[in-house]
Amino acid sequence: MKHMMKGHLNIAWKRSEFALERKGTSPIGATGRDRLMRNFVLQMGFGEPALAVLPRQYAALTFQPRIVLVSVVAGILLQSQALFAALGALLVWSALFPRPNPFSALYNLTIGGRPGAFRLGPAPAPRRGAETMAGAFAFAIALLIVAGFNLAAHVLQAVFLAASLAAAIGGFCLGTFAYHLRHGNVKFALATLPWAKNEKSYEVKGEHHE
């Protein structure tokens, strides 16, 4: 009996050691920042990221939102319909033609061209859905400025600015979140919020990349 108890204790200890090892190497059990980055990658429509490349992949995927954020701030300060229209055209182009995406091309030619950097390929459907939504916001703001509906333009600009900030530095993309909700992936959408700790796997409808 004593030997059996000792054997069970050894097995339990080995299992706990294995669990700790997995926790140290898995994005799920890592820091809150790692969890935020992992959830953002999944929300974008990509598969489970490896912890070793997670920071580089996250940085690559936030390159476009940061350019959009700078453009939105400039457009608001200048109240320029031309700037918002140009931004909208670039975003819709990126959604319709994901391979020649100008944002990804710029990243791959600069940061992505460095040794060991993560390179961007064609965007999955959730990311393209977010680009479409952002492009629609930009075009709507441009039209409102032209039409002289300043209050409505300011409201949309505030929403666009908040969404751009969330995607660029907050680990949350309103467009991809809305995409998953529209396609009935409610549990998955909630599980990929920046603060979510859910380790379960969900069947996701629609196109996703590994």
Which role fits each region the language model picked out?
Residues 1-5:
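Extreme N-terminal basic, low-complexity initiation segments
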Residues 7-208:
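Membrane-interfacial helix-loop segments of redox and metal-homeostasis proteins
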